[in-house]
Swiss-Prot record:
It catalyses: 2',3'-cGAMP + H2O = Gp(2'-5')Ap(3') + H(+). The record marks 58, 103, 147, 167, 180, 182, 184 as: Substrate binding. In the N-terminal section; belongs to the poxin family. PANTHER family: RIBONUCLEASE SLFN12, SCHLAFEN. This is Poxin-Schlafen. GO terms for molecular function: 2',3'-cyclic GMP-AMP binding; nuclease activity. The active site is at residues 15, 136, 140.
Amino acid sequence: MFYAHAFGGYDENLHAFPGISSTVANDVRKYSVVSVYNKKYNIVKNKYMWCNSQVNKRYIGALLPMFECNEYLQIGDPIHDLEGNQISIVTYRHKNYYALSGIGYESLDLCLEGVGIHHHVLETGNAVYGKVQHEYSTIKEKAKEMNALKPGPIIDYHVWIGDCVCQVTTVDVHGKEIMRMRFKRGAVLPIPNLVKVKVGEENDTINLSTSISALLNSGGGTIEVTSKEERVDYVLMKRLESIHHLWSVVYDHLNVVNGEERCYVHMHSSHQSPMLSTVKTNLYMKTMGACLQMDSMEALEYLSELKESGGRSPRPELQKFEYPDGVKDTESIERLAEEFFNRSELQAGESVKFGNSINVKHTSVSAKQLRTRIRQQLPSILSSFANTKGGYLFIGVDNNTHKVIGFTVGHDYLKLVESDIEKYIQKLPVVHFCKKKEDIKYACRFIKVYKPGDETTSTYVCAIKVERCCCAVFADWPESWYMDTSGSMKKYSPDEWVSHIKF
C-alpha cells in the first residue's frame, strides 16, 4: 500500500520516501519502463528529480528516477511495472516529467529541529559556497574570506540542483560553510503548486475561488494572499466564508497560516470526493418558475442517471386532446405554446393564453438590449430546456401581463439576431453517454407583430423551440480548474470534467 504525504499519509511506522509512506521498500532504480492506467512511459536516462517531504519536523529528500508524460496525472494515481504490479504512486512533477518515488539514489534524511532547509536551482557555470552561488572567481574569494571565521553550529541546509551536478551545503549563523556533499548527477526540482492572490480588490473572490478549485483538483498546494488593507487575515477569512462550498469538510483539508504582511492558505485533497472542486457546474435544469443551475451533487445525480440509461430517447409527440377552459396543466400549456409558435402573425397587445411553465418561458426586451440579453441569457435558458423536457422561449411577450409586445428592428439587424441565436446554440457543449451523439435540435422563428390597421410591420416576437436532448447540455464549460504541467491554471472542458466524476 502507498500513501501520499500530500494527502496526510505520513506514517512513522511505515517505510518513508519522498512524497510517500508505504508498506514495502521498493527499489525504483531498477525500472526502465513504467505504466500508468495501462499506458507505458520510459524512464529518462541520466536525469533525475530531487524530491522531498517535510513531515513531523522530518525532512526526507532524494534523487529519484522520472518518466516523461504529456498527460496530466493526479497525485495518488497508481504506477505499475510491466507485469501489472503496483510499484509506487504519482507524487511530484516538473513540467511534463513525473517522479518515481521509492528507494532512489543519493538521499538526505534530517531532523528539522532548530535548522532550516532551502532549495535552489544551480545556474550553469556557477560555483557554490554555503548559501550563495556565483561565478567561480567570486566564490573562491568568498571562501577565502569566510575561512578566517571560526565554525559555529549548523543552522541551515542548502540543496543545489543543477543540470550536471547536485550539491548539499550547510552553513552557520555567519554563512560559513560547514559541510558539503556533491552528487555527480544532473537533476530538476519539481514545480510547487503555488498561486498568488490579492484580496481587497475587484474580482478577488473569483480569483480566490479559482485558485482553491485548481489546487484541490491537483492534489493540493499553497495560496499566498496579500492585501492593501492592514488586516489581511480578516479580509481573507471573510472571503473564505463566502465560498466555503468549494471544499468538502470530509475530503479536503485547508489550513490558514498568518504572517505579518501576507497569509498562506495550505490545502490538500484526498481525491475521495466523487466530484471535482467546482465553482459553477454550468448545468441548468428548468423548473416551473426558473432556470436553476445544478450544484455539484445535483449534477452528479443527473449525470449518473444519464450514464446508467445510456442517454435519453426523444420525447413522444403530444397527443391531441381537448381540454376544458381554464385547465393549466403542463401538457395543455405546452400544446398552446406549440400553437403559438406556429402562428404566422400576432397582434400587438393580444393576451397569450399560457404563462411560464417547465416547458415555457416569456421575456421582453428592448431592441437596443436584444443582442446583449440573448448573449447573457440564451445559453442557460435553452440548455435548461434541453436538459429537462424541451421547451419554448418567446422573446417579446411580457412576463407579467402575458401580452404580446415584440421588439422593433430592421431586416439587417434581424439577420444579426438570427445569426447570434444559431451561434450560441451551436456553442452549447454536449457530453454524450449515448451512441448516436446527436446535436441539439431546435427551431427559430420571427413572428410579425401588427398593430390594428397596419399592413406592414418591423416588430417581431422571437420564438425558439428546443427539443429535449439525448444527453447533458452545458451552458458553458464548468468553472473548475487544475494546475497543468507548466504550473498554470487550466479549466476543465465539459468532457474532462465528467470523466473525473466517480460514478
